[in-house]
Amino acid sequence: MYDVADSAFTTVIVTALYALYFGTVVVGDPNQADYLWGWGASISEIIVAVVAPILGAIADFSGSRKKFLGVCALTIIFFTAALYFVGPGMVTLGLTLYIIANVGFAGGGVFIDSFLPGISTEQNAGKLSGIKWAMGYASGLLCLLLCFPLAKYIKANPTPYELSRAQLIPVVVAVYYAVAVIFPLIF
């Protein structure tokens, strides 16, 4: 299920550890970081709101929803992994990579939701959607647990060693996402 992959991104990158890394290490000012993080999320959602209807129509008309979903997945994987290169003071790079990855995430949501009518009936759509959500939630927690040992290295003014460990968090998420997304994209 695509939610198994997606929830790793939202739990670790958007909500918990990378948001903490961005504020503590990259920006260094929690208030400024929260402000920037909120703007980054808003910008990515506005981009998706503008282009999703157009891309959705193209995908429906051409029958290539799965290809568009694959592009969104590759966007998330590549730009999440690229967050590894963001260090102290690299606010613009960190925010730009996050915005692009989040566009991939939000865009993927548009396409994945369009598959539900084709794989369910009116009677079981709610149940199937609930199972999908539960599997995604559990997967997000699993990925968070995998990254949690690295979280202790998220510190203001980290040593080079601490920084190198904390920077592995988005790499773990990108690899986890890549493995989890294989099944829904192939079948």
Where are these regions (language model features)?
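C-terminal membrane-cytosol helix-exit motif in multi-pass small-molecule transporters
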Residues: 143-156, 174-187
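Cytoplasmic helix-loop-helix junction between adjacent transmembrane helices
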Residues: 97-135
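Central cavity-lining transmembrane alpha-helices of secondary-active solute carriers
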Residues: 13, 17, 34-58, 78, ...
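Glycine-rich segments within core transmembrane alpha-helices of 12-TM secondary carriers
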Residues: 48-49, 126-151
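Hydrophobic core of transmembrane alpha-helices in multi-pass small-molecule transporters
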Residues: 73, 79-111
